[in-house]
Regions:
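Helix-to-loop junction immediately C-terminal to a conserved catalytic motif
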Residues: 57
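Conserved structural motif at the start of ABC-family nucleotide-binding domains
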Residues: 7, 26-28
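Conserved ABC transporter NBD signature motif
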Residues: 65-73, 82
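Conserved ABC ATPase signature
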Residues: 143-147
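Conserved ABC ATPase "signature" region
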Residues: 106, 121-139, 164
Length: 219
């Protein structure tokens, strides 16, 4: 059976709208992201990687073209619907150093429980499974400020996992990491894509690991 894309773009144009008009970064882009696949986006700084990721996560609108998420135009999704469909992990280091690992990951359940939502047994099970999946369960009660950069990245991936989204987008997830941690994170993401049947898209400068561990490369 042919796999159905989680998100598809047809003749997509990305860029910015300013008071001087439109500034196109890339145009005529057509592609799909599929469940069970890790796709790596490669390119130099300023090549438009972050612009594409922001467009796909609905953080900024496209300039033209069609963008479909699970067969529905992306712009028709409410913020709550998007948060249940697209998980986003940014490069910026988390400022939630006063939270434990468990507490931070639990915030990823907000799309299902609401901002002040109470966690039910099912939520706690999902959180535990995510911590186990990324190999950070033993740090559940540690404060995030005490973690290494690689451990913090695992926590943010776990936070995205508990959103139960079919699509996860990561902006430079291996930035600031040493070689061993970069390999570990890339291996983990490929494993999660396959085992949890998720479409995962990441931007990276790590060409060697992307070549080895990605199912698809976008240049």
């Amino acid at each position: 059976m042919e796999k159905q894309a989680v998100i598809t773009a047809t003749d997509l144009c990305i860029g910015y709208r300013t008071h001087k008009g439109e500034k196109k970064v890339h145009e005529h882009l057509s592609f799909g992201l599929y469940p069970g696949e890790l796709t790596s986006l490669l390119g130099a700084n300023g090549a438009g990687k972050s612009t594409l990721l922001r467009t796909l996560s609905a953080s900024q609108p496209s300039l033209a073209g069609d963008l479909q998420l699970l067969g529905k135009p992306l712009q028709q999704y409410s913020e709550k619907e998007r948060s249940r469909t697209i998980g986003v992990v940014l490069t910026d280091k988390t400022q939630a150093g006063g939270l434990t690992v468990y507490e931070l990951v639990a915030l990823g359940r907000q799309p299902h429980t609401g901002f002040f939502g109470r966690l039910h047994p099912k939520d706690h099970l999902i959180i535990k499974e995510a911590l186990d999946a990324v190999g950070i369960a033993h740090k559940a009660e540690s404060y995030t400020a005490e973690l290494s950069d690689g451990e913090r990245q695992k926590v943010m991936i776990a936070k995205a996992l508990v959103q139960e989204c079919p699509l996860i987008i990561l902006d430079e997830p291996t930035a600031f990491l040493d070689v061993v941690s970069r390999i570990e994170i890339m291996t983990l993401l490929h494993q999660l894509a396959v085992e949890q049947n998720k479409a995962i898209l990441l931007s990276t400068h790590d060409i060697e690991q992307a070549l080895v561990l990605s199912d698809k490369l976008w240049l």
